[in-house]
Structures are given as C-alpha cells and as structure tokens.
C-alpha cells in the first residue's frame, strides 16, 4: 500500500489543437482593443497569453465585423449581480446568416480557464470544488469580459458580457478573457 501526498491535473490538449479544429489563427499574446459606444468609449486588454482560443475567436469576430453597429442587448442591474450582455444574439437572423459566412465549424468554443502554477489553460474543465477557484489566474471583478456559456463546458462563439462588480459565484464557470483598462 502507498499514499499519494499530492496530485495534479494532466493537461494534454493545448490551444493549437482547438485553434486548428476551429480554424482560428491562434493568438498567443495580449492585445488592446477599443469599444466605441453611444455611451462612451473604452479599452479592453485581451489576455491572449492565458486564453489564446477565446481571444483568437473574439478577434476573428471583430475582424469579420460581427459586432459592428450591434447593441448591448441585455443589461442586468440587480443589487448583487450587475452585468452587460453584448455580442450577437444567437437567435437573431443576423447571427444565423453571419455564422454561415464566418470560418466557424461550431457555434461554440471550449470553456477555457487557467490556474496559477500551470503553463497551459484547461479546456472543457468543470470546477467541482469551490476551493479550486482560489487558484484561478483571473476571477470576476469589475470590468471583466467573458464569453456567455452555450452548454455545460462550452462557451458561445459570439456572445460576451462584462461584469460591473465582483461576482465570485461565476468564477471558473465562464471563460474570462480580458478586462476594461
């Protein structure tokens, strides 16, 4: 009989696999993008170094003008939860039309989260123990941008949201891929 004093997650799939599968040019560095809105302009730092698949997908959407002249179509302003939902509503005719012309093989991308002390992000990993969120590289705080979920371990390929306050209940459940700067 023997005892295992510690155990770690073996992360064999890397971002190149998903970038090839989704036909994305994989971004490995951080990028700054600009949002111009009727309520004011702001910059967002995209964390391509830590979340290459999600950032690559988002940049492809920008390059394909999928967000151009679109509205933030849902604003949630409850006392404990505040967020702004943007992107293209997948039930919208425009999305269905555009998705067919984009270089997309799927309407979803893998859930992508990264833990401290790990080199690569984890894909489609579901956090089961709340204590695991303490080791996440990024958590939801005011200004975080993340992809909406389209299934248990999948993120939408076009819908995103910003949070306007700290929301620890969402940590590890969505792909946070940037922050307003």
Q: How does the language model describe each region?
A:
Residues 5-181:
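Cross-family detector of peptidyl-prolyl cis-trans isomerase
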């Amino acid at each position: 009989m023997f005892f295992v004093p510690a155990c770690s997650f073996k992360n064999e799939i890397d971002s190149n696999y998903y970038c090839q599968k989704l036909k994305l040019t994989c971004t490995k560095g951080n990028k700054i993008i600009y949002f111009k809105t009727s309520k004011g302009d702001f910059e967002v730092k995209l964390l391509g170094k830590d979340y290459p698949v999600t950032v690559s997908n988002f940049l492809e959407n920008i390059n394909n003008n999928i967000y151009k002249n679109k509205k933030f179509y849902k604003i949630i302003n409850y006392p404990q939860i505040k967020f702004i939902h943007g992107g293209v509503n997948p039930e919208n005719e425009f999305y269905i039309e555009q998705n067919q012309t984009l270089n997309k093989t799927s309407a979803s991308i893998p859930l992508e989260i990264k833990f401290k002390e790990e080199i690569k992000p984890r894909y489609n990993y579901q956090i089961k123990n709340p204590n695991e969120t303490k080791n996440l590289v990024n958590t939801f705080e005011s200004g975080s941008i993340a992809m909406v979920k389209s299934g248990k371990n999948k993120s939408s390929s076009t819908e995103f949201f910003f949070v306007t306050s700290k929301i620890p209940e969402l940590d590890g459940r969505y792909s946070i891929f940037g922050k307003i700067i």
